[in-house]
Amino acid sequence: SYSNLNNAQSTAATSQIDNATTVAGVTAAQNTANELNTAMGQLQNGINDQNTVKQQVNFTDADQGKKDAYTNAVTNAQGILDKANGQNMTKAQVEAALNQVTTAKNALNGDANVRQAKSDAKANLGTLTHLNNAQKQDLTSQIEGATTVNGVNSVKTK
């Protein structure tokens, strides 16, 4: 019934339930196991979208440190979730790992970096006096249509 627990957690939970000497003790051990099982499920849900996240511009054009923080948080979560090799982590430790994943995902700034690159490119365009208005308008459209920092920068250099 504790399908989200790794083997170490499951063994520990079963042991706590088996070793309880009162009904209240059994109930407390079961409640602890249930809460941990829920937290582990939430941790799994927190990384289920990792492949999608890693393909999005918000990740691919993010600062390297922010990409690393997300990747490391996911790797840490996967280690906890590993059925065979995961450690007997507490609910608080599991929740901290989920918080690490969520915080790192929310800190990804690839989309903001693309917006900044567009802003910089358009500002640079304004300084190019050798271009006529039609050329500037065409380049502005290309800048706006770009979806990555490299895409924006390739327009600037034309």
Each PLM stretch: what is its role?
Residues 1-158:
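Amphipathic alpha-helical assembly segments used for oligomerization, scaffolding, or translocation
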